[in-house]
Structures are given as C-alpha cells and as structure tokens.
Amino acid sequence: MKHDWKPGTMIYPLPAVMVSCGSEPSEYNIITVAWVGTICTNPPMCYISVRPERHSYPILKKNMEFVINLTTRSLAYATDWCGVNSGKDHTKFEEMKLTPGKASVVNAPIIEECPLCIEC
C-alpha cells in the first residue's frame, strides 16, 4: 500500500559547521549551519541553507561570500552556542574567544581555531 506524506524534510544533513561571514570586523558573524553540502564537483560548488529571518542572511546576501569552518570536539560548545545565540545580541567571535583570520580569497574571516576552512 502506498502512503502519501506531506512535503517535509526527511534527511537531516550532518555535521553542523560554523559559517563565518562579513566583509569588515564590525559585521563579522558566525552562524551554525547543519544544512550544508556539495552541489557539484566540476565546477566545485557547495551550499548552505540560511533562513531569511536570520541575522546573518542580509550579511551573506550583501557580500555574496562566506567561509564554511569545520569544527572539532573541542569546538562543540562554541558551535552549539553560535547556533542558539543571535549576532544581533552577541559579538560571537569575542564571546567565544574565537580568532577571525584573514582568508586567502574572500573578505569573510576564517575561524583560526577550525582545522579546515572552505572559502566560498
């Protein structure tokens, strides 16, 4: 017997990453994103999914670049904290004692404490 289900999310992407954005220190922000993945390998393209009502959305839309920062076990608290607190109310780099570093290609900062930073 066939079942029809309402549209929804059946597959939950993992792991969560910290996405850093902003083109200058006054707008730097970190958002925790679970919806991240590969679109294509040639040319290389990846995606993140961010709701329009999130604080980072207009920053991402304005600058059209960001960094996907992979996390580690030691960054679990910061990853969670950055996901439940808004950049409107907090300076996340400062409060989590994370270091914004200079990216090679984009203006958005990398997170120095992360082992792998993918500039997009």
Where is each model-derived feature located?
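Active-site-proximal mixed secondary-structure blocks
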Residues: 1-32, 37-119
